[in-house]
Amino acid sequence: LKAFKRVCKKTPLRMLLRGQNLLGYTPYPDDVVEKFVTKAAEDGMDVFLIFDGLNDIRNCACAAKAALKAGKRVEGNIQFTSSPVHTVESFVQTAKDYVNIGATAVHLEDMGGMIDPTTAAKTVAAVKKAVNVPVHYHSHCTGGMTEITYWEVARAGADVLDVDVSAFALGTSHPAAESI
C-alpha cells in the first residue's frame, strides 16, 4: 500500500472492506477493526468502501467511525439481492443508514448479475430520491442482463457505473466500458 501511494500520489486509493470481517470471513472485535482501518489510512488508503454481507449496518459502523476519525472518506456498499425481505424499501433504508454513519456515496452491488433491469432501475431511482449522495451501480455480466440493466439504471439516475476495459470485461466481470 505504501509503495502504491508513493507512485499514485494524486490518485485516491479505495478499498473494499467487509465491515467487522475486515478482509475475510471472520468477525473481529472493535479494537482490531479500529487499528486496521487506522493503519490502512496512515499507509495511504483514502476511501473505505464498507459493506456487510447481510446489509447489517451495525457491522459497518465501527469501521466507518474509524475511517472518518482518520480523516478519510466512507462509502456504503449495499448488497443487492432478491428475496421477500430485500425490497426497494429495505434498500432505501440501508442507504439512509449508511449516510447516517457518514457515507458520502452509496453503492448498489449486484454481485451475481441477477437483478432484472426494471427492479434495479426502481431501486436506483428510490435511493436517489432518498439520499443526497452519489449512487453507484455495480454488477457482473454473469446473468446476461447487465448491459441492459446499466442502461436502465443510468436512465434512473445512477451517478456511476462500474465497468472494465474490453480485454477484462464480460463473463463474470463487468460490462465493457467501450460498449457502455
Language-model-derived ranges and their functions:
Residues 1-13, 18, 22-137, 143-144, ...:
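Alpha/beta enzyme core
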Residues 161-170:
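Short acidic/histidine-rich active-site segments
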